[in-house]
Amino acid sequence: MAKHVTPREKRRARIRRKISGTAARPRLTIYKSLKHMYAQLVDDTTGTTIVSIATNAKALRDEVKDDDKTAAAKRVGEALAKAAMAKGIEAVVFDRNGFDYHGRVEAVAAAAREAGLKF
């Protein structure tokens, strides 16, 4: 029996074939669940995660407790950009992970750009 592949998973695979991150310019990948937003910087040459942040992470949990989901996504973008700058990363490749560039995904990207990341 064939495995069911969702349209988002097809878009995700198509995007991942085209982009990859390096140590100098890692891949900023996001994931959104119905409740939380996750973002991380990945170096695909070594397969390691450089920076990771989420709305349910200890660092942001109390800050986003009273925010709506879009405002929480903005905080994730800001926090990720600050952590990346602290590690000397200024430019990234954006991987929307098959999600539409709209709403919370757009909020993370815009906040990261405003905080200084280039992509």
Curated annotation (Swiss-Prot):
CDD domains: Ribosomal_L18_L5e
Alphabetized Pfam families for the sequence: Ribosomal_L18p
NCBIfam families: L18_bact (TIGR00060)
Family membership noted in the UniProt record: Belongs to the universal ribosomal protein uL18 family.
GO cellular component, one term: cytosolic large ribosomal subunit
Gene3D superfamilies cross-referenced by the UniProt entry: 3.30.420.100
Name of the protein described by the UniProt record: Large ribosomal subunit protein uL18
Record carries keyword Kinase: no
Source taxon at top rank: Bacteria
Disulfide bond residue pairs: none
InterPro entries: Ribosomal_uL18_bac-type, Ribosomal_uL18_bac/euk
Known role: This is one of the proteins that bind and probably mediate the attachment of the 5S RNA into the large ribosomal subunit, where it forms part of the central protuberance.
Organism: Anaeromyxobacter sp. (strain Fw109-5)
GO molecular function: 5S rRNA binding; structural constituent of ribosome
One of the GO biological process terms: translation
Keyword field: Ribonucleoprotein, Ribosomal protein, RNA-binding, rRNA-binding
Quaternary structure, from the entry: Part of the 50S ribosomal subunit; part of the 5S rRNA/L5/L18/L25 subcomplex. Contacts the 5S and 23S rRNAs.
